[in-house]
A protein has these predicted regions:
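Short active-site oxyanion
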Residues: 38-42, 62-63, 148, 207-209, ...
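Asp-based phosphoryl-transfer active-site loop
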Residues: 4-19
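Residue-level signal for inorganic ion chemistry
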Residues: 34, 69, 149, 222, ...
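Conserved acidic, metal-coordinating active-site core of Asp-based
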Residues: 97, 101-221, 233
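Short, acidic loop-to-helix structural element flanking the phosphoryl-transfer center
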Residues: 20-39, 83-90, 132-133, 189-200, ...
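Mg2+-dependent phosphoryl-transfer enzymes with acidic/Ser/Thr/Gly-rich catalytic loops
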Residues: 1-5, 24, 183-267
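Short, hinge-like loop/turn segments at secondary-structure boundaries
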Residues: 60-62, 82-85, 122-126, 191-193, ...
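Active-site phosphate-binding/coordination module
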Residues: 24-121
């Protein structure tokens, strides 16, 4: 099978529980062998650059990184190749909605997270990221853009919040990256658009690409490439959208590694 590019989601796909220490040494070895065969490997994640680089280095990845769910594409040195950002008019309306509904909101600018208050939501979030944090009244946040806007709360709260956002703001991309994270991005910011950018840059057909992911924000990417695999630990309603042969094993059971062994190495 002629696979030329492989795209990995990070959390709960190649990592367990957002823990960098759970990277499989067997997967590291396989990635090296794939690269020796001329296959290029990329990460496609909701993470920012500073939280993605340690994973890329551990895996030996030297090619483009798709960050912030496709809002930004960089080379491995952090040089920006593509960005699609949330403009001021949109993020100011999101701030209003956050205050009206009393739902926690993160804004992102240059690998720094901005919040209005330090609460349990951001305490938990910061335990999983290497990004910087600034606590500031959002009335004083006057940057020209936010890379993305992230609401954190219970699933049912975010379900209702999504409806309210969609009723008031158009031309945006809204996606769940976890059951408790609702992300609002530029309408062109999507992992699949990051994948398309990389494939077009090198003249690679989508049928020569493979991808792995576990959440709603991975769906379009997995359906676009010729070889897209949803993880066995994904929620059932998402797995139901894929043929059985497009479901990889659970991340705790080396699901990515086993599927690579099967599809690329014929093991």
């Amino acid at each position: 099978m002629n696979i030329k590019r492989v795209f990995f989601d990070i959390d709960d796909t190649i990592l367990q529980n957002n823990d960098n220490s759970t990277i499989s040494t067997d997967l590291i070895k396989r990635i090296s062998e794939m690269q020796e065969k001329g296959i290029k490997v990329h990460l496609a994640t909701g993470r920012g650059y500073v939280s993605t680089v340690p994973v890329a280095k551990a895996l030996g990845i030297k090619d483009e990184l798709i960050l912030y769910n496709g809002a930004v594409v960089v080379d491995v040195n952090g040089n920006i190749l593509l960005n699609n950002l949330v403009d001021k008019k949109v993020y100011r309306e999101l701030i209003k909605i956050s205050r009206e509904e009393n739902v926690h909101l993160n804004l992102y600018y240059n690998d720094t997270i901005y919040v209005e208050k330090y609460d349990e939501h951001i305490k938990d979030y910061m335990s999983k990221t290497l990004q910087g944090l600034i606590i500031r009244d959002f009335d004083d946040y006057d940057n020209e853009f936010s890379i993305k806007c992230l609401f954190i709360d219970e699933t049912d709260v975010l379900d209702e919040l999504k409806k309210k956002i969609e009723s008031r703001i158009s031309n945006i991309y809204i996606v769940r990256s976890t059951p408790n994270y609702l992300e609002v991005l530029n309408e062109k910011a999507n992992k699949v658009n990051g994948v398309k950018f990389v494939l077009n840059k090198y003249g690679v057909d989508k049928n020569e690409a493979m991808a792995f992911g576990d959440q709603n924000n991975d769906y379009d990417m997995l359906k676009y490439v010729g070889h897209g695999y949803i993880m066995g630990n994904a929620k059932q309603e998402l797995k139901d959208l894929f043929d059985e042969n497009k479901i990889a094993g659970h991340t705790k059971e080396q699901g990515v590694l086993n599927k690579i062994n099967e599809v690329i190495f014929g093991i």
